[in-house]
Amino acid sequence: MIQVESRLTVCDNSGAKEALCIRVLGGTKRRYASVGDVIVVSIKSVIPSSDVKKGAVSKALIVRTKKEIRRADGSYIRFDDNACVLLNNAGEIRGSRIFGPVARELRAANMKVVSLAPEVL
């Protein structure tokens, strides 16, 4: 459950390390985002000599949340951190690698994320 002012780990190799949610997309009164949702983020910390600059505004896809996700079979899954991958203006992933596991719910939202991830839970 991500809301405005939530800080997320960036888990791709775009060069950003941490991002701050500044908008949840999908309606005027929408407050929370979960796995598979797109948000607008501000980059808070970057690695040196990266293409992404600190303070840059970008869209991001949420791939992991601390808040558990209920599945159709009644089971729940949750992760240790809130993480996202950065997207470009066309909605494609900016990086070429993804670090850490991602949720199976992303299959419907974005197939490329699932194929790049080392583990799908």
UniProtKB/Swiss-Prot annotation:
Bilayer-crossing residues are none
Q: Name one Pfam family in it.
A: Ribosomal_L14
Q: Which GO terms describe its molecular function?
A: large ribosomal subunit rRNA binding; structural constituent of ribosome
Key words, A-Z:
Ribonucleoprotein, Ribosomal protein, RNA-binding, rRNA-binding
Which NCBIfam families does this chain map to? rplN_bact
Similarity annotation: Belongs to the universal ribosomal protein uL14 family.
Q: What is this protein called?
A: Large ribosomal subunit protein uL14
Q: Which gene encodes it?
A: rplN
